Amino acid sequence: RPGGNQTAVERQNSVNQLFETMRLAWLELIYWTRMYMMSVDSGADAKEQYAVEGRLLETADAITDVFAERLPVAVTRQLRNLLVEHVEMTGQIIRTLKSGDKENYEQQIREWYANANQIATLLADQNPYFAGKETRNLLLNYLDMTREIIEHQMNGEYDQSIDTFRDLSDLVLELADYLARGLLAR
């Protein structure tokens, strides 16, 4: 509309779209992570693993795109780089645990958590809404659950992996809604 005047209905539709897009992006991240984990765990051929990992990497762009309209370009670029790093680290963690290399696994976990802290700090630096502990806590809870899922899966504890994945699905919806609210509060 000329002059940027939106009706109440258009504003509400825009808000609804933000929440929906953020939720979908985070759900895709966990679903493609699970698919990648399952392809590694099942010993799928390298071509399949590569294809799934490629699609998993696209989820970093999907999440970044939700933030792109509401953050400066340089910050969006930083966020994308951190999310790509996160996804790549997740893949490496899955492969390392599958190989049985516990020492490297623990080191990679520490780096993964440091990456999540960097994401929380970046968001907090841009938006006071994200400055509290909730941003970091939600991201760390997401990592805790993802780690549990990976460990259960690689230990053949499939029921526990599925149960934790169900809980993770609920958590990322909470995380997505929190992030969307923060973007609106900006």
Regions found by a protein language model. Give the residues of each.
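Mid-chain, structured segments of secreted extracytoplasmic proteins
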Residues: 57-91
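C-terminal amphipathic alpha-helix
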Residues: 1-61, 92, 96-97, 101-186
